[in-house]
């Protein structure tokens, strides 16, 4: 995802970002929350626990909508919508089907695919031709041990976990069983 914003013109669109959508496999909620937390940290997005709304109210929701705020250097805030979407059971690398960042009419998308048995991510941007990159990642548990274990101490991972946990706690308030 980050590689789509290496060019200065693409980086500039992040200052007008208004939507982030993360579609994930049914068993990959933790990965979706961690990715959302990482994006919140990198894009300096925040949310209060009162800014959570459910898009579906019966049983387990199909999506969760969070109203986030981005602060610019002048202290001006703007709204950014974060939507976590529970997708289908189709295979995708690391359980994330698609991530879309929208800024006005511009859309930057990373879509997980499996081509010939090799997990890949297709990247689409209005500023560059589409490209496919192989996924050479490790399991979530291995990443956590590497980032937080002896010799790790990755501050980005701690920040992503903190933001993801806030989202999970906010969602949990709305997902408790009735009765």
Predicted segment positions?
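ATP/pyrophosphate-binding catalytic subdomain of soluble kinases
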Residues: 1-68
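Long, compositionally biased intrinsically disordered terminal regions
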Residues: 35, 41-48, 57-179
């Amino acid at each position: 995802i980050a590689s789509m914003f290496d060019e200065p013109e693409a980086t500039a669109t992040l200052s007008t970002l208004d939507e982030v959508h993360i579609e994930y496999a049914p068993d990959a909620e933790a990965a979706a929350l961690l990715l959302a937390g990482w994006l919140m940290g990198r894009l300096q997005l925040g949310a209060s626990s009162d800014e959570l709304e459910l898009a579906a109210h019966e049983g387990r929701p199909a999506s969760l909508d969070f109203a986030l705020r981005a602060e610019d250097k002048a202290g001006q805030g703007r709204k950014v919508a974060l939507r976590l979407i529970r997708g289908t059971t189709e295979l995708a690398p690391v359980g994330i089907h698609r991530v879309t960042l929208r800024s006005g009419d511009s859309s930057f998308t990373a879509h997980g695919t499996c081509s010939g048995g090799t997990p890949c991510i297709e990247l689409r941007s209005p500023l560059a031709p589409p490209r496919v990159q192989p996924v050479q990642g490790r399991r979530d548990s291995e990443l956590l041990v590497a980032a937080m274990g002896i010799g790790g101490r990755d501050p980005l991972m701690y920040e992503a976990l903190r933001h993801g946990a806030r989202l999970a706690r906010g969602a949990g308030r709305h997902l408790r069983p009735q009765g």
